Amino acid sequence: MTHVMENYFNDIVESICKTVKFDSSLKPAEGNYPFGKETADCLNYFLSLAADMGFETHNYDNYVGEVIFGEGKEFAILAHLDVVPAGSGWRFPPFGAVINDDPSEGGMPGVKIWGRGTMDDKGPAVTVLYCLKALKDEGFQPRRKIKLIVGCNEECGWACIDHYNKVAKMPEEGFSPDADFPAIYAEKGILHFSASFPLKNPPFRSLAAGERVNMVCDDAIAVLTPDAAEKVLGYTPDEGISFDFDKESNTLRVRGKSAHGSTPEKGANALGAMLKFFASFDEDCKNAYDLLFADRCCLKEMKDETGTLTMSPDVANFENGNLVVTTDIRFPATHKKEEITNILDKENIQYKIVNYQAPLYTDPNGKLIKTLMGVYNLSLIHISEPTRRSYI
């Protein structure tokens, strides 16, 4: 099959580039576009490409689409076309789909497509589509009805899959090309919560930080009180963080480094750096900082084979005298969300759950994982074992 796929290489690269050029990060709903027009345009391009290949396709109200191949018991391949916001610090335009083969640019040698979504998950979605085309062109008839389901809201709550479950039937079995090789049998759960911290004497007039709850905050801005403004002049932030202070407007801008919310250690949290400064002289801010960034509750002691619990406070605002912070928690697969909420309840803080996804676990010795691993090892003439993933 490898030599057959080589015939489609240039088409795959071209199609990936076309999908990457759509900025399919979440936008406000408008008309028939629940996640913004450009995300819908990306979905329609993908489905048109599949239709041109001769596949049956369905667009479910611009929430989610599917491509059908074969007959029989249904089998799902779950992918997505939405992306997290581009953020800053790109070497190439995030939606430019620049093709570059300069090894000095980092990563493995060879041709690379640069852009948001190349790996998560537009590249894999397009590649799977061409795999189905290659099988179809070779005359292969699957014994199952394969449903390539492409969502448009995987990064921000899975409203796409919620809608799919209302208008169609999700297959009982499948896999997702949205992880690492060779095969992932377990993933952490997701818990997003928004906490409100009353501030008796807030050291700022306004504060805004972060774009999305699943992205490490790389930009935070606050208008300081005169007292706080005096203190910032002699403050030195941690390495990897920059403080820019405008004396005329008393505006402090903190810049860090973005990363996926599931891997906060790869970023530098601007919100955390800002709160750390405020915590150095304000008790209410210290309360928030200690809980969210210093792990006062020892939540990060929770761990299993999928790794340790991670916390990434990513978005914050100042509302009616309260600092409101939304935090991304990824918790080990063998634990339950109630273990976290019980601890938060004891802190006597006001909070609400804004998103929850249960952990995933599939028997590594079951038929599905054994089949996937068998194909992988046979194709690469290599012996590997399935693994788990500590993030989603």
Predicted features, each with a name:
Residues 8-11, 15-22, 45, 49-53, ...:
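Generic non-transmembrane alpha-helical segments
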Residues 80, 260, 382:
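Histidine-centered divalent metal-coordination motifs
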Residues 155, 161-332:
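Midchain, well-structured core segments that form catalytic/ion-binding scaffolds
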Residues 1-87, 324-326, 343:
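N-terminal helical capping/dimerization or prosegment-like subdomains
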Residues 74-150, 156, 168-169:
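Active-site metal-coordination/substrate-binding segment of hydrolases
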